[in-house]
A protein has these predicted regions:
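Conserved RecA-like P-loop NTPase helicase motor core
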Residues: 172-173, 179, 342-423
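Interdomain helical connector at the RecA1-RecA2 junction of SF1/SF2 helicase-like NTPases
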Residues: 214-304, 321
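Conserved C-terminal RecA-like helicase domain
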Residues: 141-144, 272-374
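Short basic/glycine-enriched coil/helix segment immediately N-terminal to the Walker B
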Residues: 53-57, 139-142, 158-171, 365-369, ...
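Conserved helix-turn-beta segment of the N-terminal RecA-like "Helicase ATP-binding" lobe
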Residues: 101-125, 323-332
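SF2 helicase catalytic motif II
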Residues: 164-201
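ATP-dependent helicase/translocase motor core
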Residues: 1-97, 101, 105-116, 141, ...
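Inter-Walker segment of RecA-like/P-loop motor cores
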Residues: 111-158
Length: 423
């Protein structure tokens, strides 16, 4: 591990000063923290460099969720910029995501480490960057990375035309969450990657690629480097996850309410989804969730621990939020339950972006929101170490399930586990 070559590699590329805000004595302050490249990040970066020497310019890096793939991407910008400079080439980096919230999170992580982040809000803006044939868009002289939300261009299937290639420019595409629905032919991303045959293409994933997905991602080739769940847990970068069933009494009440509502549904022309949106069902669900999170905090002796509810429908999410304070007031009549939880609702069509960002920040950093109520948002890429209790109100499968449950696997204080409660 500590050979001279590796030690020099870490000293040259593997130290970052990360700026973030943290609550200190009741105040939010900005602090800088020195981060050292983790060993799996070092081996991945070394392997990428070795693959280029072998003439391989694409591949997949599978590092388990929560092990620092965005940080790895940051280190790669320095490693590869230096590598290509020795070949009289200037590297230009693109970080590709497929969600708006992931664009924001990745941008913040890169900026916290000192990278200048550029974004492209339209196809025209992105194409203008390509036409410039410049490694840097700004004039600061600091390292840059362009973060692109490919979802903006999902319906754009037109061919991407690039100007005559600048022989000293080396484009590097880093594609985040490589396991998700990418079609190797006909999409804007495929056309973009295909337009520059000389570009490096590094696909990141936190979950294994299934057989059909490996076929879909054949454009990236084989695994460059892997770092599995068991190693991440042993190394202390992620926590084990425990699945819990809901208490029998609540399970029986919810089943009884569901069965009664189901009978009503059969008599009327009503969608079954409306059962889980019914006031009676929602209120009983809230009684369990609020009581459970409060007891969990009492047992752990930590009132900073947070929760998240993944709802069956967006309407159910709205109702859970609407009835939250009412049900909490009812439960607070019991002295053992008399503490106050604050809920935040995160839906793509609820509130504006600034309001949603404020709610998320209040949960992650300010600790003025204790439980998030969601439907589709924040199930991937959301990194909040205090989140330790995840309530599944609906079924998720395959990668969506793996992505969601790993929201609770980040180390936090003295916690040894993240918990998933399955309804």
């Amino acid at each position: 591990m500590c050979s001279t070559e590796r030690l020099l590699f870490i000293l040259k590329y593997g130290i970052a000063y990360v700026r973030f805000h943290k609550e200190i004595n009741g105040k939010i302050e900005f602090i800088e923290q020195k981060h050292i490249m983790r060993y799996q990040q070092m081996f991945a970066a070394l392997t990428v460099r070795n693959k280029i020497d072998e003439g391989i310019n694409s591949g997949v890096i599978w590092h388990t969720q929560g092990s620092g793939k965005t940080a790895l991407s940051y280190y790669l910008t320095y490693v590869l910029a230096d590598y290509f400079s020795k070949q009289n080439k200037v590297a230009k980096f693109y970080f590709i995501v497929d969600r708006l919230d992931l664009l924001k999170q990745a941008s913040e992580e890169f900026e916290a480490r000192g990278l200048i982040v550029k974004t492209a809000s339209s196809r025209a803006e992105l194409m203008e960057q390509f036409r410039n044939n410049q490694a840097q868009e700004g004039n600061t002289g600091k390292p840059e990375i362009t973060v692109v939300n490919i979802q903006r261009f999902a319906e754009d299937r037109s061919k991407v035309e690039l100007p005559a290639y600048a022989t000293n420019l080396q484009r590097v595409f880093i594609i985040d969450e490589a396991h998700r629905g990418y079609k190797p032919e006909g999409s804007f991303l495929a056309n973009l990657l295909d337009a520059d045959k000389n570009a490096m293409k590094i696909a990141l994933t936190g979950t294994p690629l299934l057989k059909e997905e490996r076929e879909s991602w054949r454009v990236f080739g084989n695994y460059i480097h892997t770092y599995y769940y068991d190693k991440s847990i042993l190394d202390g970068y992620t926590l084990k996850i425990i699945r819990e069933d809901i208490e029998t009494q609540y399970k029986e009440r919810l089943s009884e309410i569901y069965e009664k509502l189901e009978i009503l549904v059969e008599k009327k022309d009503v969608k079954k989804s409306q059962i889980v949106e019914h006031d009676n069902y929602v209120k009983e669900l809230l009684r369990y969730i609020i009581s459970d999170l409060k007891r969990f905090r009492q047992i752990q002796g930590d009132n900073t621990l947070g929760g998240m509810v993944i709802c069956e429908t967006s309407e159910q999410a709205r109702k859970l939020f609407a009835y939250f304070d009412e049900i909490q007031a009812e439960l607070n009549k019991d002295a053992s339950m008399k503490s106050h939880l604050r809920a935040g609702l995160i839906l793509h069509d609820s509130d504006d972006k600034d309001t949603r960002d404020k709610i998320i920040d209040d949960f992650k950093n300010n600790m003025t929101v204790d439980i998030l109520i969601v439907f589709n948002m924040l199930l991937t890429g959301f990194d909040a170490p205090r989140l330790k209790r995840l309530y599944f109100g609906r079924k998720l499968k395959d990668h969506n399930l793996l992505q969601a449950i790993t929201r609770v696997n980040r180390p936090y204080k003295e916690n040894h586990y993240g918990y998933v409660i399955d309804f």
